[in-house]
Amino acid sequence: MQNQLNALLQSAKKSVADAQSEIVLEEIRVDYLGKKGKLTELLKSVGQMPADQRPLLGKAVNEIKREIQQLLNAKSTQLREKSLQEKLNKEKVDITLRGRYDHLGAIHPISRVSERVSQLFSMLGFQIAEGPEIENEYYNFEALNIPADHPARTMADTFYFSGDKLLRTHTSPVQIREMEKQGVPIRLIALGRVYRRDLDQTHTPMFHQVEGLVIDKRSTFANLKGLLQQFLNCFFEKDVRLRFRPSYFPFTEPSAEVDIYQPRTDKWLEVLGCGMVHPNVLRNLNIDPDEYSGFAFGIGLDRLAMLRYEVTDLRLFFENDLRFLGQFK
């Protein structure tokens, strides 16, 4: 019996050592330690032995069983560690390799233009102000000398909420708020999103605008013309031809629209509106128009982006087509 046990142990050791997977290891366990396993069969035969030998043989069988189980456990741990190491080796990353840059994003062209405009006006001594996009009728219209019967105040042109709340149609309300807060003299620009009921090749219901304001005791229309010429020359990085046409805005008097000459098409394209601040706007803020004067201007940032990047349809900027936006990396 002892010889059989020793032979069985050696056979089990060899089988366990040769096992290369958990599945094979489980088959070995069943073959030796299962209900019908080799060691179980030997244990059954102990009852046929002389009574004085049974305790010793039973003890020997249990020791062999315990040793085989230990072999199985050790081999199982070894196989799991080997499997884990192989998996880690497959997933290993060489941190010295160059990264992939194929899908890096880029600053949106409207954001590029906005940053450029802010930078240029900061260099010209303007402070940059912001204000709420949801406004009331006083700041958006009344304080700017826009009467109640003006077409811009109709539902056809303006997005209204309940009461007197609306989506601002320009960034001029920021100028009113800043003059209330700071007083005069003042020199600022206000950039941001504005909203109007309009949609075609050169207009969208939401667009971006920068409006500038200068109020002091010596401002003239000549100062306004010189400032706009200098700004546009710097923005387009070349000398541009401008044309000032008489126009009408409720908040400026006199008023003008400014066109820029396009040599490629031999045409003039409107880029902004401007004028001297209307005395009524100053009076609304308790500023004496006999002592102070100033000028204001409004420029569509989207229109500037169209000109700078030679884009013919304004709506392309807002359609999130990566084929289009990828050109501006």
UniProtKB/Swiss-Prot annotation:
Which catalysed reactions does the entry list for this protein? Answer: tRNA(Phe) + L-phenylalanine + ATP = L-phenylalanyl-tRNA(Phe) + AMP + diphosphate + H(+)
A GO molecular function term, named singly, is: phenylalanine-tRNA ligase activity
What is the UniProt remark on how the cofactor binds and its stoichiometry? Binds 2 magnesium ions per tetramer.
Its needed co-factors are:
Mg(2+)
UniProt keywords, alphabetically: Aminoacyl-tRNA synthetase, ATP-binding, Cytoplasm, Ligase, Magnesium, Metal-binding, Nucleotide-binding, Protein biosynthesis
Q: Name one Pfam family in it.
A: tRNA-synt_2d
Which residues are listed for Mg(2+) binding in this entry? 253
Localization of this protein: Cytoplasm
Q: Name one GO cellular component term.
A: cytoplasm
* Major location category of this protein: cytoplasm
Q: Family membership, please give it.
A: Belongs to the class-II aminoacyl-tRNA synthetase family. Phe-tRNA synthetase alpha subunit type 1 subfamily.
Q: What is the protein's given name?
A: Phenylalanine--tRNA ligase alpha subunit
The source organism is Coxiella burnetii (strain CbuK_Q154) (Coxiella burnetii (strain Q154))
UniProt lists the gene as: pheS
